[in-house]
A protein has these predicted regions:
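A surface/extracellular/periplasmic glyco- and lipid-processing/surface-interacting theme
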Residues: 54-111, 120-386
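Ser/Thr-rich, Proline-interspersed low-complexity disordered segments
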Residues: 13, 18-73, 83
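Short, intrinsically disordered low-complexity segments
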Residues: 1-2, 31, 36, 191, ...
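Sec-dependent bacterial lipoprotein signal peptides
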Residues: 1-16
């Protein structure tokens, strides 16, 4: 009876989900070969909700940036509900953000880390990294972009995506992670799901990890770099709200919720095409859990966007640069760092590691000429190239 009720609730949620389509459109993703379709509504796995370590048990010195205990997720600083999951590679899954009718997405709130970055024609896309827990459905899955090469190499991840432009696919195929790419082909775990006439590509992370193990490309990786601690560092400014404006069609807002300690995501619901026109927002939810999408840390990264060809950008996420980190209602001016084979880390102005709040992180990637304006506790970032 309980299982039947869960299925009914989830079906009701899927049937009610819809959105507005923006003026800006994205290039359709080419699919390769017909794959099996999901014929039953997926049920939530018990591991969909990561276990958070009680505050009193967190070490005063924090965890990281190296020598993480075997049961602590180095991407969240939290004890894993199932430490066995940490003996594998992370999974980087491309998740669509536009057009608006793909929202709400499945599984986005359950990722350890999410990167939100500009693609083309005013749109953004998510690179969601799953590691410390498994999620029964993630999607809709879309195509890869140049920046994904840096992310897959840094996080040593299994790379699940829909397709890519020719030049991007050539770079992926020539990389050292070419054997870790998983696309829509027969016998891969990427499946088609078709609610309300939409033909979505989705994946179960447990199936994706098992597929990597079967192919002999899974196993524990060195993911050192991030530092976590519960107390917020000194030197911050009030930062209970931030806006990230990518284009007239794609923009978002984060509101700090002192009860959960998370920044809750609000997404655009209409294009802003006229001077003086107000932005319009709605809370982003997770279609898998029907819960609001929120992250413990939100970090805005200033990164060079190099024009590769008309409409295609190569986002160069290596080296170091300026950044703003938001946690616990506070904003911090920091520096981001990433060597060619490492994950993203942050430092304070004095060079000491910036302490991420234990939990999940969303990185907003914007151009080097992007502007920032502060009004009281609210911060507004406007994306500008390069």
């Amino acid at each position: 009876m309980k299982k039947l009720l869960t299925i009914i609730v989830f079906l009701s949620m899927v049937l009610s989900a819809c959105g507005l389509s923006p003026t800006a459109t994205t290039t359709p993703t080419a699919t390769r070969t017909k794959t099996p379709r999901i014929t039953e509504t997926p049920t939530l796995l018990p591991t969909n909700s990561p276990t958070i370590t009680p505050t009193l048990s967190y070490p005063p010195g924090g965890y990281g940036p190296s020598n993480f205990p075997a049961d602590v997720d180095p991407l969240t600083g939290l004890q894993a509900a199932n430490p066995v999951l940490l003996q594998r590679r992370p999974m980087l899954i491309k998740v669509s953000n536009m057009p608006r009718n793909v929202r709400p997405q499945w599984g986005l709130s359950l990722a350890d880390i999410v990167f939100d970055y500009y693609t083309e024609e005013g749109s953004t896309r998510f690179a969601a990294i799953f590691y410390g827990n498994d999620v029964s459905m993630v999607g809709p899955i879309r195509s890869g972009r140049f920046i994904d090469a840096d992310l897959v190499q840094g996080y040593k991840a299994i790379f699940a995506f829909g397709s890519a432009y020719v030049a991007e696919m050539q770079r992926f195929n020539a990389s050292d992670f070419a054997n870790r790419m998983v696309v829509e082909e027969p016998y891969t775990p990427l499946k088609r799901y078709d609610p309300n006439g939409f033909d979505y590509l989705v994946v179960n992370t447990a199936d994706l990890s098992a597929y990597a193990t079967k192919r002999g490309i899974n196993g524990v990786q060195n993911l050192n770099a991030m530092f976590f601690n519960l107390p917020a560092p000194a030197g911050g400014q009030a930062g209970t709200q931030l806006y990230v404006h990518y284009s007239a069609a794609t923009y978002n807002r984060w509101d700090y919720d002192p009860v959960s300690g998370k920044y809750m995501r609000f997404s655009d619901t209409a294009d802003v095409t006229e001077v003086g026109q107000s932005e319009q927002y709605a809370a982003l939810t997770d279609r898998l859990t029907d819960q609001p999408v929120g992250f413990d840390n939100v970090v805005v990264l200033y990164v060079n966007h190099e024009l590769y060809s008309p409409g295609i950008y190569d986002i160069l996420l290596s080296g170091s640069g300026d950044a703003y980190a938001f946690r616990d209602g506070q904003a911090y001016r920091v520096q981001w760092h990433r060597n060619a084979t490492d994950i993203v880390s942050l430092t304070m102005p004095d060079g000491s590691p910036f302490p991420f709040k234990p939990g999940t992180t969303c990185f907003e990637v914007i151009g080097l000429k992007s502007t920032v304006a502060q009004t009281g506790q609210s911060w507004r970032f406007t994306h500008q190239m390069p």
